Amino acid sequence: QKVKEMKSKVKDLCLHCDVTNKDSVKRAFKIIAETYGGIDILISNAGTAIGGSIAEVNDKILRQSFEDNFFSHQNCASETIKIMKKQNIEGCLLFNISKQSVNPGKNFGPYGLPKSALLNLCKQYAVDYGSLGIRSNGVNADRIRSGLLNDGMIKSRAKAREVSTDEYMRGNLLLNEVKAEDVAKAFFHLAVSKKTTGAVLTVDGGNIAASLR
């Protein structure tokens, strides 16, 4: 339903795709390339928030989290690279990572572990394809209200940290809640930064434990 609503508002191509399935990704990217002639920028945004004590989490759940939060990005990025290499006109990969990749939260390991792997995946693409003019960067955001971090998840994370939901959402150095618009601006900045690759931009209101160099 949401896809239909989006399609009615913008002149865009909306496709159903299981990003954890290589064949599904391949079909979708083939249609994209045929429709627009190629791909200039990939914003890889897939993810599911899965919590649990890491020593006790069900193995099936942990493996599914890696499918959702790591391999989905690898599937999309690898198909994008194939298209970009054929185009031979440079390109840009952008990954929605998470502050969990460098600053894990209590009982949130099933989500944080694949995000840590995703951060390194982002850097690996920068190393492997920089010579082709293909940039790879990421955004480490934190506590953004979305379909992923919904009211129920916010209450759960606030309880784990023994704070109120308002304190949880403003729990940063600036004491300001970070919004989706702030993250969008970060992605745009990286998309147009032609001399930047292998970088991870934090958008979290300030969290020294999650800060990078």
For the regions a protein language model found, what residue spans apply to each?
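Conserved mid-core segment of classical short-chain dehydrogenase/reductases
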Residues: K26, K30, A49-R63, K82, ...
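Residue(s) in the substrate-gating loop at a strand-loop-helix junction
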Residues: S98
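Alpha-helical segment proximal to the catalytic Tyr-Lys
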Residues: K82, V127-S131
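Catalytic Tyr-X3-Lys loop
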Residues: T48, A55-N75, L94, L118, ...
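Active-site helix of classical SDR
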Residues: A77, P114, C122
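Short, small/polar-rich loop/turn modules that mediate ligand/substrate recognition or access, typified
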Residues: G38, I43, G130, R135, ...
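A glycine/serine/threonine-rich, flexible loop-to-helix segment
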Residues: S131, I144-G171, R213
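C-terminal substrate-recognition "lid" of short-chain dehydrogenase/reductases
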Residues: N176-V203, I208
